[in-house]
Amino acid sequence: TLAGEVGASFIASSADEKPEDIARRALKEADKQLADVLILDTAGRLAVDAEMMAEIQALHQTVKPIETLFVVDAMTGQDAANTAKAFNDALPLTGIVLAKTDGDARGGAALSVRTITGKPIKFMGIGERTEGLEPFYPDRLASRILGMGDDGHCCSDIARIHLSTLTGVYA
């Protein structure tokens, strides 16, 4: 599991278990382990319906989280805006996570979601690995939208390379 890859505990669940019951078990386990952070990840949705929104609202009421982040696929375009509006109307969102920013889409969904929700984009996902979750830098997204590339991301990648590797290249 992803939790195992990053060395985090996780709570297994079954399909017949209610989300609120899973969340209660997770809260108890987090308290028992004296955890500082508990992440509850709900299933991604392509369509929004009343039953699903009622379920997510009940879950939110059970957990009473400090942060409620809406994760949006940067490649979904107008659908992202519609889904963001529905979630923003139903929940007190505190921020946005823009996923799949390494794809072909330039990031127009980010502008729509930010405008509709009024919430800040806090993180962006580049690739599918946990190392690809980064703080959001508006100037980098603006460069991509304008077709100028993302030099900041390139530079930060280069900065991660160990100096001894570069020494061998230029020796």
Language-model segments: what does each one mean?
Residues 23-27, 31, 35, 47, ...:
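Conserved phosphate-handling catalytic cores of large alpha/beta enzymes
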Residues 1-15, 21-24, 109:
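P-loop NTPase switch/communication element
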Residues 15-16, 73:
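A generic secondary-structure micro-motif detector
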Residues 53:
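Active-site-adjacent beta->alpha loops and helix N-cap segments on the catalytic face
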